[in-house]
């Protein structure tokens, strides 16, 4: 004979809401998009650089405030690909610090080890670290890709403001010394670059690789640059390398 024991009371169902996890929240890791954007605005206000790449970075965040690198609670793996390119800019005659290499590497490490300051106003609080990564990754990406593709120096500005006219006593004008048609990065390029950052990894890596000049002399000059320590010769090589970027 079998006995079945049952309760006359109805089964009580348990519902779990987000509020039930509130006690598990750690303020050190508490971030929001609004607070990240607020810190990006602070970085923009203190950024006085007048390079075209940096102005493009500021323009993106001033107009759309769209996150390009930060995913849900992490940073895109494309950041590592970008850093691998920046780590080799010394072979092009540049300092890594011009592309924020040390800052970005350190902040990426902080994110991946959750090494944040507990005080929200501290320099290395989670919000400030994510804001720095978002802003300076974009600046580094545009500095590298725009510089490699179009040149790190604008030849129109560099050469057409040297020879001041003496016959114009009312206005400051200059004789044009550079008139060769040369492409410059515009808003269309900026939109393309931002879309590449948001896109898939293959296109991102391909975009970086194809940013370098197509001039066949470029590779020869780079090779020569890395074989000599003569300052005057290196200076001439760097000038010719830059000319290869003006297309």
Where are the regions a protein language model picked out?
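C-terminal motif of bacterial Sec signal peptides marking the signal peptidase cleavage site
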Residues: 4-7
């Amino acid at each position: 004979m079998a006995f079945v024991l049952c309760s006359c009371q109805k089964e009580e169902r348990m519902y779990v809401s987000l509020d039930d996890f509130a006690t598990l929240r750690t303020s050190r890791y508490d971030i929001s998009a609004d607070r990240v954007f607020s810190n990006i605005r602070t970085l923009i206000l203190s950024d006085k650089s007048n390079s075209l790449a940096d102005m493009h970075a500021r323009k993106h965040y001033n107009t759309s405030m769209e996150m390009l690198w930060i995913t849900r609670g992490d940073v895109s793996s494309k950041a590592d690909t970008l850093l691998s390119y920046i780590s080799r800019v010394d072979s092009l005659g540049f300092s890594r610090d011009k592309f924020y290499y040390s800052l970005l590497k350190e902040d990426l490490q902080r994110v991946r080890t959750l090494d944040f300051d507990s005080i929200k106003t501290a320099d290395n609080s989670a919000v400030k670290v994510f804001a720095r990564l978002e802003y300076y990754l974009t600046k580094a990406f545009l500095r590298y890709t725009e510089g490699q593709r179009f040149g790190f120096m604008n030849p129109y500005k560099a050469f057409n403001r040297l020879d001041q006219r003496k016959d114009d006593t009312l206005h400051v004008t200059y004789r044009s010394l550079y008139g060769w048609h040369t492409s410059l990065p515009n808003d269309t390029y900026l939109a393309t670059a931002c879309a590449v950052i948001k896109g898939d990894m293959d296109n991102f890596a391909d975009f970086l690789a194809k940013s370098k000049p197509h001039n066949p002399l470029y590779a020869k000059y780079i090779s020569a640059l890395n074989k000599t320590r003569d300052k005057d010769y290196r200076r001439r090589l760097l000038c010719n390398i830059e000319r290869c970027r003006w297309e």
